[in-house]
């Protein structure tokens, strides 16, 4: 009776909300053209499941436990821990937040970051430990242990008993789990939160014999979408000119910097060159990615901060925080000024949408999704500014996500129509990536189908320059990184 009533109530709610939706063409279009087809698609890929290697899962769990034991042993041999235990008269337990708080802030005298728990105590979460690790080794050791324990307990140990007889994990994907419209994942495993820094979990997602894991990632998708939305001719020409996008951007933005231009004329990369200048790195630009990857990532933060409408203060704070080196508001202001002097259309688009959000408290995406932003009316300027930035983020993130989702749905349908359902199986969408298990002799065909569907013109394309698709192919989802690290 309960199950039957659940279905009845759901249908009644459907009738109620459908009547409301049809009155708004944009929202009804999202429902009819995106959500309904995507719902059927996600049902299919959830049934397909994520392919795992049981033997590798077991081996990986043992490997991770060994690493945990080694990390704990290293922590306990550290002089500060021994002194703390002697003073306390008991063993130190890194899982005890009370003991950890006493060790870090009282015994070691590290300055609290200002972040507090719900009870008002100083926080010792991952963000805090990362910041404290800049001043002492112990927080990094504790963070390392926590991360390894989480990988083992949340993924390696939890996945194995939940696998079906065919060694596949059937988890969930949600169309309604985020405010940006991106997919979320829940159930047996959250596919959106698989560790990126450690390949051990990805390495356990393994194709069956005769098949390969194929991952398609959109390249520079959000910048691409912003260029089209803003109708910024100069920014679109950067894509149309081919070559390295970020290098081309730098050639335009920093055209008056003769020293920097010399780097680009010899094949430099935008983010690497920016990092070399901003952080005064003792190497050539083409060596930055290998020797100073962190600084290069910080340089990227400047570029994307500009695109999302972050001001000098926000960019200065973010780069300073992430890099550990002071990046002044003056430096941030100069970069923003140079950027917008070249890309007038992007600046106008950002300004127009900021005003619309501030006036209305909502914004629509290109495909018709509506993001409600009531906090723009907050009397707290910080909260209001953050809400505006969230709206700008939504405009580009939701479109890139929808391009990926719509393309994947279309590709899945074409694959079934062509009779390849058992030979090309999309099993997950992770951020802006489409994952599939494909027969080795049909990989080229699969790439052709998916690329054509992703790059189809849906009113968000640059003429003669479709959005970029990068493909990775391998026996497992780590694409060789698992074997390289663990043998």
What is the role of each PLM region?
Residues 46, 50, 62-65, 69, ...:
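Hydrophobic alpha-helix feature that most strongly marks membrane-spanning transmembrane helices
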Residues 159-164, 202, 215, 236-239, ...:
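Short, contiguous acidic/charged loop-to-helix segments that flank catalytic cores in large enzymes
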Residues 47, 170-171, 175-176, 250, ...:
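Conserved catalytic core of nucleic-acid polymerases
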